[in-house]
């Protein structure tokens, strides 16, 4: 006798654990014929057990899991399927999967309703200073007139079609001796597992057990919260009979700011200055997210290069739950150069005397050819498509040494 962890499925088919594939098939066909619902209408549960046992044991991978680890192997190794939980509970006395699909269960064992997700748009000022706002939502609550029963006391009856489960197991024959089990929502009770005569239904909720109610939530956006962060209101989602309400979850969505960009607890901004400011120092002010007017000074004689970044410590975003600690503010300077011919040519020599000396130009030896620098418009391309084709015919090693013409000089 084979050494296996559990023999219940083998016992259902009446075969030993070491049974061959042919022995399993023979036993299954015999039992399926005897307990088929068409022949034996009262043996539906028995037929499901037989089909489930054969489905597991006829699959080499599932059989190996079951032989080695028993019930636990099937729990952890199977991906689940419609109706399997109901069948598994008949055999092992416990559910393999949640019978109602994707609904989870709470710690007290009750089914738990779905969470309600709502986006909440907030400004960068809101996230910097914190904000309290009110949000109006519509949700289902248990009908107070019938206490969520749907009708007067005693009028609610278990659905006979699905036996109160809300779903029905359908058996479809694929081939002689081979059947498929399918699970579908019960059409008689619309998946509720209960039916109420129309004359006995609650007038307020019309037998639906729940009514719509407007809920006002007070939302606290704390200082330092971030885009994508969640604010959860536990148990405030839709109510339903016998179901623990899920949560209302607000997903923060930060709106774009015209001045600042956020990076974690740091802030970034770009400021334009002229050439004279870049060379001779400057002073400017800006309004911070809390309304303060911040003055930035840079001394004469210290040069600001185009595109350089300077930092102001402690003027970034407050840390979440530690708002007295703040990140930094990074300022990128966009140096604006004068337009062409902005100065009288006669004055250029005076300007050059004030600026650092030019580098020495090396002596030109041999034949030379003078070329002209022109404006480059990246939207029109380089115009050198035909010339580039010649390079494409060269070897990979040669072509890798040629740089494309799309690199634009920075104006300085």
From Swiss-Prot:
Residues 359-412 are annotated as: Disordered. It is a lipid-anchor. Keywords: Acetylation, Chaperone, Isopeptide bond, Lipoprotein, Membrane, Metal-binding, Methylation, Phosphoprotein, Prenylation, Repeat, Ubl conjugation, Zinc, Zinc-finger. Residues 8-70 form the J domain. Its main location: membrane. CDD domains: DnaJ, DnaJ_C, DnaJ_zf. The modification N6-acetyllysine is found at residues 39, 152. Zn(2+) 1 binds at residues 143, 146, 202, 205. There is a cross-link at residue 134 (Glycyl lysine isopeptide (Lys-Gly) (interchain with G-Cter in SUMO2)). Zn(2+) 2 binds at residues 159, 162, 186, 189. The modification Cysteine methyl ester is found at residue 409. The modification Phosphotyrosine is found at residue 391. A zinc finger (CR-type) spans 130-214. The keyword Secreted does not apply. GO terms for cellular component: cytoplasm; cytosol; membrane. CXXCXGXG motif repeats lie at residues 143-150, 159-166, 186-193, 202-209. One of its GO terms (molecular function) is zinc ion binding. Pfam families: DnaJ, DnaJ_C, DnaJ_CXXCXGXG. Residues 410-412 form a propeptide. A lipid is attached at residue 409 (S-farnesyl cysteine). It is found in: Membrane. This is DnaJ homolog subfamily A member 2. It comes from Bos taurus.
